[in-house]
Amino acid sequence: MDSRFFIVFADILLPLLLGMALRRWGLSREILRMVIKANVVCVATFLSLVSFWSVHVTKELLWLPISIIPICFIPVLIFYGFQKNRFQNPLDQGSYMISMMLGNIGTLAGLCAYVLYGEKGFAYVQLIAVPQILVIVLFCFPMAQRFYEMGAQRTMETKRTSFIKLLLTPNQLPALGVAAGLLLSGFHVERPQAVGTLFTILIHVSAWMGMMPVGYDLRLGSVGTYAFKLWPIFPVKFILLPTVLYGLTTLFVTDPAMMTCVVLSAGAPTAIFAVAAAQLYGLNVDLAESSFVTTTLAFLFVLYPLVYWWVEFGVM
C-alpha cells in the first residue's frame, strides 16, 4: 500500500493526541489561541493562494461552491422532517442539527484530496469549504441563538457579536487567498518552484496547527454519553450525502478529480465549528464533541479508505 495513504491518519490523530497531552502538561490556552490565529491568518491563506494559483477556471468549477448548498441543507431537511424529536431539550436539538449539517471540509477533506490529487485536489475542496463560512454565519449562528433562547425559555436580549463583525474578521483571509490565487492564475503569472515546495510542507503544518487546539479542548468523557444516540448522523453523512452529491455532480462535472473531491466534502465528519457554535451559544457541547470524535473516526477508518481505493483502482 502507498505510504501516502497513512499521511491523513498521522496529520489528524497525532496532533489531536498532542493537544490532549499539552492540556495535561498545563500549556497556556493563550498559546493555543496564537497557534489558531497564525494558522488561519498566515498558513491557510498562503495555502489557498498557492493552490488556486495553478487552477484554471472552467464552467465545471462553478459547481463546487454551489454544492455546499445540498451538502449543508439536506441534513437540515432530514432534521426537521424526521429527527427533531430525537432530543427533547432545544439545547440538545440545536447541537444535533449543527453537528449533522457542518462538515470538516477545509482541513480533513482537503488533506485527503491533497493526498489523492495534490494541490489541485486541495484547491477543489477549498472552493467547497469557503462558502461554508457563509452558511455558518448566515444560518448556523442564528439557528444556534434560536435554540438557545428556546432552551432558556426566554427571549431576553443577549450580547452577541454583530453579523458584520462575524463576517469581516481575519478568519476570512483564506477567502482572499483564493481570490488572489485565481487572479494570478488568470493573468498567467508564473509560479516559482520554491512556492510549490513550501506548500508541500505547510499543508501538513496547517493540519497539525488546526487539530492540536481541538485536542487541547477535547473531553473524551463526553463521547460515550452520546455516541449511540447519534447514530442517525452516520447514514446521513457517510451514505446519503455522498450518494446524492455524486449523482448531482455527474450532471455538471466530468472531471473525476472534481467528483471525488465533492464526495469527500459531502462525507466530511462533523466540523469543529459545530463544537465552537455550541460553546458560543450555550448549546450541548458534550453532544457536539461526541459527534466530532465518532464521525471523525468513522471517516478516517471507513469512508476515506473506500474513496482512496476507489481512486487508486481506477474506478474514478
What does each of the following model-derived ranges do?
Residues 1-316:
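Alpha-helical transmembrane segments of multi-pass small-molecule/ion transporters
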